[in-house]
């Protein structure tokens, strides 16, 4: 009791002393904090300058710090630092490589099949194997799914057929009609003894209700939030999001592509209307790679290691294929910016055509130059984007690239049937990529992404026909009219582009 009184007396005296000297302390603290804060801003400015980033990104951050020193200081601490080589991501990369080594025999390149490809196509898939560690599969069946209704008709049916396990990994999960349909099936399968693991992003799914998660957990579904954000304790991980959309069922059937879980992806949102997206159904050997990507992400977040033959056995996933399929993961845990380098390789190796669809088109200088050079060389370069904003700054930043692309001969189209959310690139009508990666800096440098690269499959032919159909529901941008757009539009676009390195 005596000790408690002494403690209370001490704090009472301390409070009294602070109250009496409040004027002096206030001026002293304000002055000290101002000096410390100014030195911190200068220190961060020096760090940015000597990081040897791209000059545009360096200049943008320095301008933000100069114009908004207080906000810019905290904004840089949260979003500006490059943590690709941080201890946490480096550890994941090492563990992923160990996981790859466990199935090394299953991951060797099929040299006989590669010899049937053209020289530049061989180089692309060797590069993908070098960067992404996964070989091309010629024992996989694929099917292109062209919108939410078709995609979820297949997904819901496949989930109902699950017998052993269901693995889901999503950026956005909504507690709405579609979300409830998924939930009810997962609960039913869990009660049947099917092992269900569900990994959802902590930022993309921040609106997901606690009741939704708890109902699934109570039924035995393992629900895990990827890098959850715990206010007010924000960390740099808020900037590195899991943008992947993966489903693996029994190690035999898989899905990957651009669609999240929500009613808007079925065209039920009044603003967006019809939601044009592209997803891929996969059956066969390539599913094992999707499985491995999921299990690595699961281990990263939970610490649970489940890399065994129960989930990765080759006997689970062999089927007859009609071409090559290669699943490639990209993210801050990889040494290289994998998808960016593969997109660049696809563009620079094109002989006849480059067709791109992306809802968020903010290319870096390398991709932008490659597209312009291709068009100037006589290659048919087409870019399909939305005609309405999903994210306004990104939408206006995208349009700022149109004049120089149009001048080089690139054909730019805006989709007018609804909202264009497909993330595809088709080269020479032979090679294509479908996945989660946008043609923007966030997908190239920050997000965890996954893409399927296809070679001479029936799915590539379907992508070509779908693209032609989409162009029939699009408006081609006229260069003469576009370059004479109002000054205010150009101002907004230029400002948005200036901020694009921060997006």
From Swiss-Prot:
Domain PLD phosphodiesterase, residue spans: 238-265, 416-443
Q: Which PROSITE patterns match?
A: PLD
Q: Which GO terms describe its biological process?
A: cardiolipin biosynthetic process
Instruction: Output the Gene Ontology cellular-component terms.
Output: plasma membrane
- The domain of life is Bacteria
Which keywords fit this entry according to its UniProt record?
A: Cell membrane, Lipid biosynthesis, Lipid metabolism, Membrane, Phospholipid biosynthesis, Phospholipid metabolism, Repeat, Transferase, Transmembrane, Transmembrane helix
Q: What is its EC number?
A: 2.7.8.-
How does the protein's chain sit in the membrane according to the entry? Multi-pass membrane protein
Q: Tell me what this protein is called.
A: Cardiolipin synthase
Protein species of origin = Alkalihalophilus pseudofirmus (strain ATCC BAA-2126 / JCM 17055 / OF4)
Q: Which gene encodes it?
A: cls
């Amino acid at each position: 009791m005596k000790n408690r009184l002494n403690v209370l007396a001490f704090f009472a005296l301390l409070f009294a002393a602070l109250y009496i000297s409040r004027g002096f302390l206030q001026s002293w603290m304000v002055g000290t904090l101002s000096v410390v804060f100014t030195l911190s801003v200068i220190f961060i400015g020096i760090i940015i300058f000597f990081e040897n980033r791209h000059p545009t990104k360096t200049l943008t951050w320095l301008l933000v710090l100069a114009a908004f020193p207080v906000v810019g200081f905290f904004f840089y601490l949260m979003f500006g630092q490059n943590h690709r080589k941080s201890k946490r991501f480096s550890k994941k990369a090492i563990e992923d490589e160990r996981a790859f080594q466990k199935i090394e025999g299953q991951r060797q390149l099929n040299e006989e099949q590669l010899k049937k490809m053209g020289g530049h196509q061989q180089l692309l898939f060797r590069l993908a194997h070098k960067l992404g560690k996964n070989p091309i599969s010629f024992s996989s069946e694929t099917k292109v799914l062209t919108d939410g209704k078709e995609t979820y008709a297949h997904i819901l049916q496949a989930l109902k057929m699950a017998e052993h396990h269901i693995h889901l990994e999503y950026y956005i999960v909504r507690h709405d009609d579609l979300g409830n349909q998924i939930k009810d099936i997962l609960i039913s399968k869990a009660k049947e003894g099917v092992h269900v693991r569900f990994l959802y992003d902590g930022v993309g799914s921040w609106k997901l209700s606690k009741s939704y998660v708890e109902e699934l957990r109570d039924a035995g579904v393992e629900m895990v939030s990827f890098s959850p954000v715990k206010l007010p304790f924000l960390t740099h991980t808020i900037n590195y999001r899991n943008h992947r959309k993966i489903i693996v069922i029994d190690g035999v059937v898989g899905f990957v592509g651009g669609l999240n879980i929500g009613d808007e992806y079925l065209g039920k949102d009044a603003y967006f209307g019809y939601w044009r997206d592209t997803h891929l159904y996969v059956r066969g050997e390539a599913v094992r790679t999707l499985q491995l990507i999921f299990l690595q992400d699961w281990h990263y977040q939970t610490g649970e290691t489940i890399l065994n033959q129960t989930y990765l056995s080759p006997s689970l996933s062999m089927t007859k294929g009609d071409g090559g399929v290669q699943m490639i993961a990209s993210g801050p845990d990889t040494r290289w910016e994998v998808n960016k380098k593969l997109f660049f390789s696809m563009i620079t190796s094109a002989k006849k055509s480059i067709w791109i669809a992306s809802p968020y088109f903010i290319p870096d200088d390398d991709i932008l130059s490659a597209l312009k050079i291709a068009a100037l060389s006589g290659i048919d370069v087409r870019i399909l984007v939305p005609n309405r904003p999903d994210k306004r700054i990104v939408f206006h930043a995208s349009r700022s690239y149109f004049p120089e692309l149009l001048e080089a001969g690139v054909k730019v189209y805006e989709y007018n049937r609804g909202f264009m959310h497909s993330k595809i690139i088709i080269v020479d009508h032979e090679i294509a990529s479908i996945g989660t990666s946008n043609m923007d800096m966030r997908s190239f440098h920050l997000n965890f992404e996954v893409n399927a690269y296809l070679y001479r499959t029936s799915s590539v032919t379907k992508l070509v026909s779908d693209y032609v159909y989409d162009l029939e529901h699009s408006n081609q941008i006229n260069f003469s009219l576009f370059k004479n757009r109002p000054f205010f539009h150009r101002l907004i676009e230029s400002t948005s582009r200036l901020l694009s390195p921060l997006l």
